[in-house]
Amino acid sequence: MDIIKGIDAAQLKKDIIDFNTGDTIKVHVRIKEGTRERIQVFEGIVIKRQGGGIAETFTVRRISYGVGVERTFPVHSPKIEKIEIVKHGKVRRARIFYLRDRIGKAAFKIKERKNFK
């Protein structure tokens, strides 16, 4: 069991910023197309963060051309170049799936957290 923990510890990223559910973030993802590699930015609201250790994931939701798009990322994935926080949101739930039912501008309405560290 200690061997598995040692391998997992070697794979963990050290430079992960602290973000929570309700925050608006930009995820810079490395995408390989044939021989070329480029970085694509996916900006949206974090609706879920789950798991722990190497298996920790988060889901980001955004509206693209009137259609809701959700993407789940592993936190410690080598394909994630960096994560930027655009806005800190104030929510009272760990999973804010109620945003899926909202249409238009209401899909983005989350109060901003003023006193954050």
From Swiss-Prot:
Gene3D superfamilies: 2.30.30.790
GO molecular function, one term: structural constituent of ribosome
One Gene Ontology cellular component: cytosolic large ribosomal subunit
Claim: Electron transport is one of the keywords in the record: no
Superkingdom of the organism of origin: Bacteria
GO biological process: translation
Protein family membership: Belongs to the bacterial ribosomal protein bL19 family.
The protein, known as: Large ribosomal subunit protein bL19
